[in-house]
From Swiss-Prot:
GO terms for cellular component: cytoplasm. This is Ribosomal RNA small subunit methyltransferase J. S-adenosyl-L-methionine binds at R101, D102, E117, R118, S153, S154, D171. Specifically methylates the guanosine in position 1516 of 16S rRNA. Keywords: Cytoplasm, Methyltransferase, rRNA processing, S-adenosyl-L-methionine, Transferase. It catalyses: guanosine(1516) in 16S rRNA + S-adenosyl-L-methionine = N(2)-methylguanosine(1516) in 16S rRNA + S-adenosyl-L-homocysteine + H(+). Gene3D superfamilies: Vaccinia Virus protein VP39 (3.40.50.150), YhiQ-like domain (3.40.1630.10). Its main location: cytoplasm. It is an enzyme of class 2 (transferase).
Length: 248
């Protein structure tokens, strides 16, 4: 995949080169999307819209730390949707990991989460955040045990995962309604990079074959069910819906 690769002063150019090889990235100075290695972390920037700022993964501080400490905990919608209750913590495969937010919430509550991400730039950002999280004295010990990343397309990888998880979680990109200059900066940068997941309908069947207890699909409230298959149950929030499917 082509992206503009930049190394800020103080960062290690050798590390950027290794990163490019690992994720099979080629540098294109004309590309609108830039992957920037700073002394602190790896960032994604949209070069023609610098005001959007940088996207990066940070499990240690910022919004994710705040959500872990002060969020709804087991009362969070995603926790209820995957079936967390009492002492039960399902083993989860997050087949559309993105920046790992929902996976982190589940891991912080005690679930083991195996994340799949097929886009190499997104996988590189997620891996960078994970590696920094693994080194943190507070969250590192449980993060290493509970959150792992596999760079692969779920369309093919879901057939090979072993052992089978109790829950498969899907949150495919869905086109936003036009009104959204309101759409968060992150989604704008993301959609420039990966577009919408036009082949996401193909994930439902292999996910249902893999999960032993349930498949959970996160959808915007205005979106039709994935693959137009009616869910067996659903839970709703202000702007989203968690569709729940039984295994097949």
């Amino acid at each position: 995949m082509s992206v503009c690769l930049l190394c800020e002063e103080g960062a290690d150019p050798g590390a950027l080169s290794i990163l490019a090889q690992r994720w099979q990235l080629t540098s294109d100075d004309e590309a609108l999307m830039a992957l920037v290695l700073t002394p602190e972390r790896l960032e994604l920037r949209k070069r023609d819209e610098p005001k959007l700022g940088a996207i990066y993964v940070d499990f240690v501080s910022g919004t994710m730390a705040h959500r872990r400490k002060f969020g709804g905990g087991r009362g969070e919608a995603v926790a209820k949707a995957v079936g967390i209750k009492g002492n039960y913590r399902p083993d989860v495969v997050d087949a559309t990991a993105g920046l790992g937010r929902d996976a982190f919430v589940l891991a912080s509550l005690g679930c083991r989460v195996r994340m799949l991400e097929r886009n190499p730039v997104v996988a590189a950002l997620l891996d960078d955040g994970l590696q920094r999280g693994y080194q943190d004295a507070e969250i590192g010990p449980w993060l290493r045990e509970r959150m792992t990343l596999l760079h692969a397309s779920s369309l093919t990888a879901l057939g090979d995962i072993d052992p089978r998880p109790e829950v498969v979680y899907l949150d495919p990109m869905y086109p936003h309604k036009q009104k959204s200059a309101l759409v968060k900066k992150e989604m704008r940068v993301f959609q420039s990079l990966v577009g919408s997941d036009d082949d996401a309908d193909g994930l439902l069947e292999p996910a249902r074959r893999l999960a032993t207890k349930r498949v959970v699909v996160k959808r915007p409230d205005y979106a039709p069910p994935l693959a137009n298959v009616q869910a067996h149950a659903a839970s709703t929030t202000k702007s989203h819906r968690f569709d729940i499917y039984m295994p097949v």
